[in-house]
Amino acid sequence: STLMRSSAASDVYKRQFQSQESLNVYSYATDDYFAFLEDNSGSNFSRDKMCLGVGRFPIRTVTEATQMVDKTISYMENKDSGSWKNNVTFVADDGNNEDSFTTNHMKQADQLAEAIEEMQPGFLVNKVYFDAYKRSSLGTYPDVHNEIEKLLKSGQLLINYTGHGSTTHWADESVWTQTDINNSSYKHLPVWVTATCDFTRFDDLNTSAGEDVFLNKSSGGIALFT
């Protein structure tokens, strides 16, 4: 496996792959490129296969690097094999006013949740789907926020979010925000899987919410697939 060390936005040597397209809606940055090691691979991202795993520590300073290495070692050496390692949570958006994805994200999340329940019945699957909660007069879902907070504090092996997002929050209702992440305090660190936009945009000039999940030295999460 390969580990990229830096936030691409602050990397003088630009150790990242940028797509050829310059238009914002078509352009993207990815580290997958560095794992296409076979001859003539790397020109077709939808077809070519990575030859090894690639991860990135989105660090900007020596202090952050030290903290993240310590955090990783602490997680790997954690002997607490309590029930938290059997807990997984799926959070699903209900779309927004500008699209027709009223149930799409929930269906996608539920397919994954049901697959785990079928193939790994030992896991306790928690489902936090927006439509199952009451919307406030301000158009937000305070109970969704509270449930996410409660589940994270109780300990989760994995938390999965499917829906709209940005560099600072989940969903247009802002059910989980960068402020929540930075203020979080819980012992057991989950793996975060986020099927959303921009949440861990490591080449942004500002630190994204997903990066802060990892950079939180004592809470947040231990890794992200995003």
Q: What would you call each of these model-derived segments?
A:
Residues 1, 6-226:
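Cysteine-dependent hydrolase recognition
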